[in-house]
Regions:
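Core catalytic lobe of class I
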Residues: 2-319
Length: 321
């Protein structure tokens, strides 16, 4: 029997999202923000968990099962922000996709790092980027008819180092913005806006230093600090590249979604009092930020130890509202 809406709000269920979401009522959530487990990099000690599939396409198929359910329980004017990591075929270490969110944030006693991927993947040359995010997005188009409205790049200013000497270090993550309908979904453009860059100001100091300027000599105060790069009070439509550092939570020993990354998504794509879903809740950042912004949250997490952390984060946050 399907649960009632009041039974899912401000609740994180311990279990497998493929099973738990089946009990959610149709069209009950307004927004989904999530980051699924990496393929083959984590073992939580639970049979048939997502991420331990022997084949890449099987992994993609299991994610499709989850997001078919998300499509069903999302309201017609709802949307989803899906953060996905990639892998290299034949590699034997972290591949640098959702490094902070999955290589760290999903590391507890039952989830220590392991590379469980096969050394070869059919149809993919060794050491090739497998394009898993794009493959998943395309599969979602054909399964439930998800509409890919945008591909957002989160450019990290503090990426995890990689021991590679034959390719650039991965310093970004992919976030797909998807909807159920082509137009008419809820989207508050003002809430999704960002400060407008001032073309008349100089490059900020860090950019000058990056491209060879050795000092701040000759720069005015605004240019030296970078503050002059934005017009006070003027906004522009959000760009598809978001530059932010990773974030850490004082109650955990890992990095998480930066609240600044997902706050505009929650404010811009859900109304106050709306329900925000995360079927792979992890450390609970989506729940915490949703509650702080006056939304309800709901979600699923496989690891029982994370459930304790999520409850701690949301209860501590209440003291500051």
């Amino acid at each position: 029997m399907k649960k009632k809406v009041q039974e899912i709000v401000n609740t994180v269920f311990v279990g497998d999202s493929r099973d738990v979401l089946k009990d959610y009522p149709d069209k009950c959530v307004d927004l989904c923000i999530t980051s699924p487990p990496y393929w083959g990099l984590r073992d939580y000690g639970v049979d048939n968990q997502i991420g331990l599939e022997l084949e890449r396409d099987e992994y993609i198929g299991e994610l499709v099962r989850v997001f078919d359910e998300v499509h069903r329980i999302l309201k017609d004017d709802g949307t989803m922000f899906l953060n996905l990591g990639d892998s290299y075929s034949g590699s034997t270490g972290r591949s640098g996709g959702i490094s902070e969110i999955n290589s760290k944030a999903r590391q507890l006693k039952t989830g220590a790092y392991k590379d469980l991927r096969p050394s070869k993947v059919d149809g993919v040359p060794p050491q090739s980027l497998m394009q898993i995010p794009s493959r998943v997005a395309i599969a979602l188009q054909y399964s439930s008819g998800w509409i890919i409205r945008s591909k957002i790049i989160w450019s990290k200013t503090n990426p995890m180092p990689e021991s590679v000497d034959n390719r650039p270090t991965k310093s970004h993550e992919t976030i797909f913005f998807l909807s159920k309908i082509p137009t008419g979904y809820y989207y508050n453009q003002e809430a999704m806006s960002e400060p407008a860059k001032n073309p008349n100001s100089g490059d900020p100091w860090w950019q000058r230093k990056l491209y060879g300027e050795p000092s701040r000599h000759g720069l005015d105060g605004a240019a030296a600090s970078g503050a002059g790069n934005f017009r006070t009070g003027e906004l522009r439509n959000m760009r598809t590249v978001i530059t932010l550092p990773t974030n850490s939570y004082k109650g955990a020993h890992f990095a998480t979604f930066p609240p600044k990354l997902i706050s505009p998504f929650i404010k811009g794509c859900s109304r106050e009092g709306g329900i925000v879903l995360d079927p792979f809740m992890g450390s609970g950042t989506v729940a915490e930020v949703s509650k702080k912004l006056g939304r309800l949250y709901t979600g699923v997490e496989l690891n029982k130890e994370y459930h304790k952390l999520i409850n701690e984060r949301t209860s501590q946050m209440e003291m500051f509202i």
